[in-house]
């Protein structure tokens, strides 16, 4: 197991983001585990999470010029990763909304 993988699992368990048991997923499927990304926000060790994400991107040799974070929980993950990736090169973030606002610019993608 790689160092970043171990750190991610340890963080997930400490933050109680990774749970084991009998869960019904949004899709209706049964699962022996559940991952609640919001628990990572509440735990407050987001820099560790961002380091793990950056290590995985580097390991896989991924190249991109923007990071997309799907609403809502994906927005904070994309922002964290972009912040870490921006240490060497500017990395913009975009995200969507689940609903179009009827005020401002009325955009579904930001």
Region spans (language model):
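PRPP-associated nucleotide enzymes
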Residues: 1-109
């Amino acid at each position: 197991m790689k160092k970043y993988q171990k750190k991610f699992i340890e963080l997930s368990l400490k933050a109680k983001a990774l749970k084991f048991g009998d869960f019904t997923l949004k899709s209706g499927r049964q699962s022996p585990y559940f991952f609640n990304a919001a628990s990572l926000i509440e735990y407050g060790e987001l820099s560790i999470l961002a380091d793990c994400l950056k290590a995985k991107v580097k390991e896989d040799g991924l190249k991109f010029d923007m990071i997309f974070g799907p609403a809502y929980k994906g927005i904070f993950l994309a922002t964290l990763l972009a912040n870490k990736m921006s240490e060497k090169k500017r990395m913009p973030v975009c995200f969507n909304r689940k609903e179009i606002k009827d005020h401002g610019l009325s955009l579904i993608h930001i």
